[in-house]
A protein has these predicted regions:
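Central cavity-lining transmembrane alpha-helices of secondary-active solute carriers
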Residues: 55-76, 291-303
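Glycine-rich segments within core transmembrane alpha-helices of 12-TM secondary carriers
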Residues: 122, 141-173, 374-387
Length: 451
């Protein structure tokens, strides 16, 4: 550990490039969390949607990662990291601009396609940016460096939530009526409200698309560093080496479960708060609590990154995993404000999981890292599948959130967080297993040095 203290997290010659690439981490955070509240927003604007249908927003959004991650890895393998970033930004902007015709035609499926195109772009950006960050300094500080870059992702996430709250949720007219009053409106009035609200939903995405174009120009004018090595392995050899790497394979599984947990906790907090409001007669604003969760997430990321200076990353992952499981259990069992506090507290412990799993899984890799990073980005498909499963639990007794009481006292919306709990337990086990392995390897190394 004394060695890591003497090594700078980012090499001096790459500081500017590190800053530019870090902006991309915030940029996909904006898209992620601008979209998260859209599940409940589309449900209000299009009340004919079931909870499962509304959750297809997240399915379409995160399925793009699975679909495009491997092609992105093959693309940057053939060309360059910079080329991958440029393609990613072009797709990002294109998907954002597609919101305009989607709103014009009032097509839910068109919106889903637009979101899918955005995440095809994000798949390029994440597949490119994450491994590139690892190369911008000494490998001893690679995981710490990635955590530092990822610490700016929740800043983007908070920005996305603020945009969603003040540019969309507060402006849509569908939310101004009670269910009874809304159903009593004439077909002409309903059509007018829907046209207005879908137009409002499209505005922040179109603005985001314009901002992405500005970043695209900056990236085109920025000289990016070449990676520390050229691709010497064939694609087949890379796959063979990855499939033989048990640590990597388990890392992909852990990443899929982590992303599923994160998206479920940040998506269904809106339904969780709605149920509290209806049950206890409160008027809580879900977005504010989601922003609070983001702030806790950001704080946890910075604290976790600092802890890694002197503590094994796998050990931190294990302990943070335990904390997440404990809070998820509280979100299930407790009702009202205590349950809500437990739910947002999960974000503290999720904060370091994505970059830490990423860094551990790719540790000591060489040529196969580009393909390996694609597998970890494809694992984000967990964010596409899990919310649909959670939405199906909410539909057990009808369109409400407490139609069914589990064990006689747990509303179905609370019980649905059993899925994030299971996901976080899987991540905890990965942290435990890799920590045990690292301790064993360290002992073996010390014995060899002694001999």
């Amino acid at each position: 550990m004394s060695l890591s203290k003497k090594i700078s997290v980012v090499s001096k010659e790459y500081v500017f490039q590190f800053v530019i690439i870090t902006i991309l981490f915030a940029l996909w955070g904006i898209a992620n969390d601008l979209t998260t509240p859209m599940v409940s927003t589309f449900k209000k604007v299009m009340p004919e949607l079931t909870n499962v249908q509304a959750s297809l927003v997240q399915f379409a959004f995160y399925f793009g990662y699975f679909f495009m991650a491997l092609p992105a890895a093959l693309f940057i393998r053939k060309y360059s990291y910079k080329s991958g970033i440029i393609v990613g930004l072009i797709l990002y902007a294109t998907g954002a601009f597609l919101f305009y015709p989607a709103a014009h035609y009032q097509s839910y499926n068109f919106f889903l396609v637009s979101l899918w195109v955005i995440t095809c772009g994000l798949a390029f950006l994440e597949t490119t940016s994450n491994p590139l960050i690892l190369f911008l300094g000494n490998k001893e500080t690679a995981t710490q460096r990635l955590n530092l870059a990822q610490a700016f992702n929740p800043i983007g996430a908070i920005t996305g939530l603020v945009m969603a709250q003040f540019l969309v949720i507060k402006e849509i007219k569908s939310d101004d009526y009670s269910t009874e009053a809304f159903n009593a409106l004439s077909s002409t009035e309903l059509a007018s409200i829907r046209e207005n609200d879908l137009g409002i939903i499209s505005i922040p995405y179109i603005g985001l698309g314009l901002f992405v174009l500005v970043i695209l120009v900056i990236i085109c004018l920025t000289k990016m560093p070449k990676t520390a090595h050229e691709d010497k392995m064939s694609i087949g050899e890379s796959f063979k080496k990855l499939l033989a790497n048990r640590n990597y394979k388990h890392g992909v599984i852990a990443q899929a479960f982590y992303v599923g947990a994160q998206i479920m906790c940040w998506t269904f907090i809106f339904q969780y708060v709605d149920n509290i409001n209806k049950t206890f007669g409160l008027e809580l604003t879900a977005t504010y609590y989601n922003i609070g969760a983001m702030l806790l997430f950001l704080s946890g990321r910075w604290v976790g990154t600092a802890l890694m200076k002197n503590t094994n990353p796998s050990k931190i992952l294990m302990y943070f995993g335990f904390g997440g499981v404990f809070c998820a259990a509280g979100a299930i069992v407790f009702q009202g404000i205590p349950g809500l506090i437990s739910l947002i507290s999960i974000s503290i412990f999720m904060s370091i999981m994505f970059p830490t799993i990423y860094g551990i899984a790719l540790k000591d890799m060489a040529d196969e890292a580009k393909i390996g990073s694609a597998g970890l980005v494809m694992a984000i498909v967990g964010g596409a599948l899990m919310p649909v499963l959670q939405g199906s639990i909410l539909d057990w007794g009808g369109s409400g959130f407490s139609d069914v009481q589990i064990l006689g006292f747990i509303p179905e919306v609370n019980f649905s967080f059993i899925l994030p709990l299971i996901c976080l337990a899987v991540v905890t086990h990965y942290g435990y297993a890799t920590y045990k392995l690292s301790v064993k390897q360290k002992k073996t190394k010390n014995i060899l040095v002694t001999e």
